Amino acid sequence: MIREAQRSELPAILELWLESTTWGHPFIKANYWRDCIPLVRDAYLANAQNWVWEEDGKLLGFVSIMEGRFLAAMFVAPKAVRRGIGKALMQYVQQRHPHLMLEVYQKNQPAINFYQAQGFHIVDCAWQDETQLPTWIMSWPVVQTL
């Protein structure tokens, strides 16, 4: 079931984020993600609209939107991957936001494939100084240029 996250759930969401991001980014050292906890907690989760997927009292996924259009986070617990939770969360936010942008590591092909299956298109590239890795900027729906 998808519902809006409560502020009191931010620690549980942060725990789910750390588990999922470490699992989903094996090309980045786990200590990098642990070092990011204060930033994710204080700058992202605290300032985003957050929705969670809850099942039997457990949080199995979440999505965070910042500034009404930036998909800042989208994670599903590793044990719950490929059950349709990510797709349901994405459709939920797509129904509420007419335009979404996100940034994804170019090495994260499973995530890129997922986003493309949800209608996102690569529109630009960027560089992450902290990880020294390239990223794709993706947009939904596709941005038309003249």
Curated annotation (Swiss-Prot):
Reactions catalysed according to its record: L-lysyl-[protein] + acetyl-CoA = N(6)-acetyl-L-lysyl-[protein] + CoA + H(+)
InterPro entries per UniProt: Acyl_CoA_acyltransferase, GNAT_dom
Disruption phenotype: Mutant shows the same motility as wild-type strain.
MF annotations from Gene Ontology: protein-lysine-acetyltransferase activity
Keyword terms of this UniProt record: Acyltransferase, Transferase
Keyword Transferase on entry: yes
Keyword Acyltransferase assigned: yes
E.C. number(s) listed in UniProt: 2.3.1.-
Domain N-acetyltransferase intervals: 1-143
Family indicated by similarity: Belongs to the acetyltransferase family.
Name by which UniProt lists this protein: Peptidyl-lysine N-acetyltransferase YiaC
